[in-house]
A protein has these predicted regions:
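N-terminal leader/linker segments that precede catalytic domains of diphosphate-processing enzymes
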Residues: 1-199
Length: 199
């Protein structure tokens, strides 16, 4: 029997570099799933991500693309924001109250008087790990702009070599297929002139 995929969410933090679009990536540790691969910040959706309250909600059309259940759609987005905060130190936040969750990461955000600013998220894509794999993810990918993030780049150390990398250069790094597909999708959008913060 194929393993049931776990819900997960990732966030591509983008910035307009001097020559081209850059994306925040880091390297997974040797013992991690996808060991030594370059990835975006992200991870499994936790139960606490359902309890946490955002400062602003997803744009309606984005929510509908994620799931017919608005609560489930929001939970994916909340997980992407939490994982990015844990792994990079950067938070897509606005003044708000996350509420009682019993989660260290959410409590940290709450102490700062911030909650996820979900209206700043755009949707990149969805991927499910093939049935033949031992570890499987049902993954949603979002993107947001660096200028909308607060905090200092650092994080828990789960990702090393954290850096903004020009997307063309990132394509040459060691990564799993789905990471590559999402980078290619961002390049397509850039070629089609999708709205950058400076435009």
């Amino acid at each position: 029997h194929p393993v049931k995929p776990k819900d997960s969410a990732s966030l591509l933090v983008l910035r307009q570099g001097s020559a081209c679009l850059e994306v925040l990536m880091g390297r997974r540790g040797r013992k991690a799933v996808f060991s030594n691969a370059y990835v975006f910040a992200g991870g499994k959706v936790d139960r606490v991500d359902r309890l946490a309250q955002p400062a602003s909600d997803l744009l309606p059309d984005l929510g509908q693309r994620l799931s017919s259940d608005p609560h489930k759609a929001r939970t994916f987005a909340m997980a992407a924001v939490r994982e990015t905060f844990e792994e990079t130190g950067l938070m897509l936040g606005a003044p708000g109250d996350v509420g009682e969750t019993g989660s260290e990461s959410w409590d940290e955000m709450r102490a700062l008087g911030l909650a996820p600013d979900l209206r700043k998220l755009a949707y990149v894509g969805h991927a499910i790990t093939p049935a033949s794999r031992a570890v499987r993810f049902n993954a949603r990918f979002f993107c947001a702009w660096e200028q909308d993030m607060t905090g200092e780049l650092g994080g828990s150390g789960e990702l090393t070599e954290l850096a903004y990398i020009p997307i063309e250069d990132a394509l040459k790094l060691k990564m799993v297929d789905v990471t590559l597909f999402m980078l290619e999708e961002m390049l397509r959008r850039e070629d089609n002139g999708f709205a950058t913060p400076s435009s």
